[in-house]
Amino acid sequence: MQIQQIEGGFGAQDARIALVVSRFNDFIGQKLVEGAIDCIRRNGGSEENIAIYRCPGAFELPMVAKKVALTGKYDAVVTLGAIIRGSTPHFDVIAAEATKGIAQASLETGVPIAFGVLTTENIEQAIERAGTKAGNKGFDAALTAIEMINLYRAM
């Protein structure tokens, strides 16, 4: 008997994808949105199947992503934002809670929720990951969502 291998592909032709974006550090968030939309387009997706939801900050991303996922309108959700370390422990709390909350929302809803939230030590690292030296993590998160949509469809 041959082992069956199931994988998701990268076609986004009929994929309905919601982007949930933190407005805090918006100049980074907007670059991540541009990267995500570019990825969806390059993989055959269309703008009419993309919706963008904006929330105040990274702490709110999990609850908005969960609510969006529960609408049943989308095949996947992509969370985008930037949490940049400051001089207080606030970074650690927000980064941990956003990460945990997004994972929990995906598990509870059964809808793939991709993590495209930057957690960086400084603004330079965030800029690098939003479309310069280190690529665009919004693009990467959208690609993860597309692959997960196709994997779910193959199950």
Curated annotation (Swiss-Prot):
GO terms for biological process: riboflavin biosynthetic process. Pathway: Cofactor biosynthesis; riboflavin biosynthesis; riboflavin from 2-hydroxy-3-oxobutyl phosphate and 5-amino-6-(D-ribitylamino)uracil: step 1/2. The active site is at H90. It comes from the Bacteria. One of its GO terms (cellular component) is riboflavin synthase complex. Its EC number is 2.5.1.78. Keywords: Riboflavin biosynthesis, Transferase. It catalyses: (2S)-2-hydroxy-3-oxobutyl phosphate + 5-amino-6-(D-ribitylamino)uracil = 6,7-dimethyl-8-(1-D-ribityl)lumazine + phosphate + 2 H2O + H(+). (2S)-2-hydroxy-3-oxobutyl phosphate binds at S87, T88, R129. InterPro entries: LS, LS/RS, LS/RS_sf. GO terms for molecular function: 6,7-dimethyl-8-ribityllumazine synthase activity. It holds the Pfam family DMRL_synthase. 5-amino-6-(D-ribitylamino)uracil binds at F24, A58, F59, E60, A82, I83, I84, F115. PANTHER family: 6,7-DIMETHYL-8-RIBITYLLUMAZINE SYNTHASE, 6,7-DIMETHYL-8-RIBITYLLUMAZINE SYNTHASE DMRL SYNTHASE LUMAZINE SYNTHASE. Catalyzes the formation of 6,7-dimethyl-8-ribityllumazine by condensation of 5-amino-6-(D-ribitylamino)uracil with 3,4-dihydroxy-2-butanone 4-phosphate. This is the penultimate step in the biosynthesis of riboflavin. Belongs to the DMRL synthase family. This is 6,7-dimethyl-8-ribityllumazine synthase. The lineage of its organism: Bacteria, Pseudomonadati, Chlorobiota, Chlorobiia, Chlorobiales. The gene is ribH.
